[in-house]
Amino acid sequence: MGIDVAENTGEIYSNLAPREKLLAYGSVSLTDAELLAIFLRTGTRGLPVLRMAEFLLKEFGSLYHLLSADYDTFCSHKGMGLAKYAQLQAIAELAKRFFSSQFMHEDIMSSPSVTQEYLQNLLSGRDREIFVVLFLNNQNRVICHEEMFKGTINKVEVHPREIVRSAIKVNASSVILAHNHPSGHAEPSLADKIVTDKVIDACNLVGVKVLDHLVIGRQCCVSFAERGWI
């Protein structure tokens, strides 16, 4: 009849409520817990699915930390097993591919907001600094991107020669740099400016242009290009 049969009638209603809300008012009307409940589908005895979703978000602290948890950590929580772990890992990977597909076939210089949104979703919420490089062809389309350097909570060591080597390997004409600030504040530091200049100098030697450096905070990002620093 088009409706999944569940053992617990009360559980059906707790599961359907977020779906009905989504269909009536759109996905943006749902809380993180309600969206998560739709994917989890069922709770456990004494723990309806929506309460389970709320509990998981509280325990892990954020959607990012929940979706990036390893198997042992995830399954250490009541009611969490292989099936739900696989479901959430599939969700996380689909989200990554969705955002990636949005800008892989566009001239990203004509749609910078798409790039910023992608990088915001990729890096915001990470608990240590990650330095990402987007490699572009001569039509400003993304060839690939790479998380090149991983650091600590407040610094990451960047090697310009490694960026140049990767750019040559994929025949990139230009690059966009990006890294996050786990503190949540996107304002670039003096060290950020210095390393950007070093990468620009190294790339100039082989004819690769640095188009921008984006610093990602919790809710916003700062563009070096928009500030006239590149």
From Swiss-Prot:
Domain MPN: residue ranges: 108-230
Domain of life (superkingdom): Bacteria
A Gene Ontology molecular function term of the record: metal ion binding
Coiled-coil intervals, chain numbering: none
Keywords: Hydrolase, Metal-binding, Metalloprotease, Protease, Zinc
Stored PROSITE patterns: MPN, UPF0758
InterPro entries: MPN, RadC_JAB, RuvA_2-like, UPF0758, UPF0758_CS, UPF0758_N, UPF0758_YicR
Annotated positions binding Zn(2+): H179, H181, D192
Motif (JAMM motif): 179-192
Pfam families linked: RadC, UPF0758_N
GO BP terms: proteolysis
Gene3D superfamilies in alphabetical order: Cytidine Deaminase, domain 2
PANTHER family recorded: DNA REPAIR PROTEIN RADC (PTHR30471), UPF0758 PROTEIN YEES-RELATED (PTHR30471:SF3)
UniProt-listed HAMAP family: UPF0758_YicR
Entry similarity comment: Belongs to the UPF0758 family. YicR subfamily.
Name listed for the protein in its UniProt record: UPF0758 protein plu4865
Record organism: Photorhabdus laumondii subsp. laumondii (strain DSM 15139 / CIP 105565 / TT01)
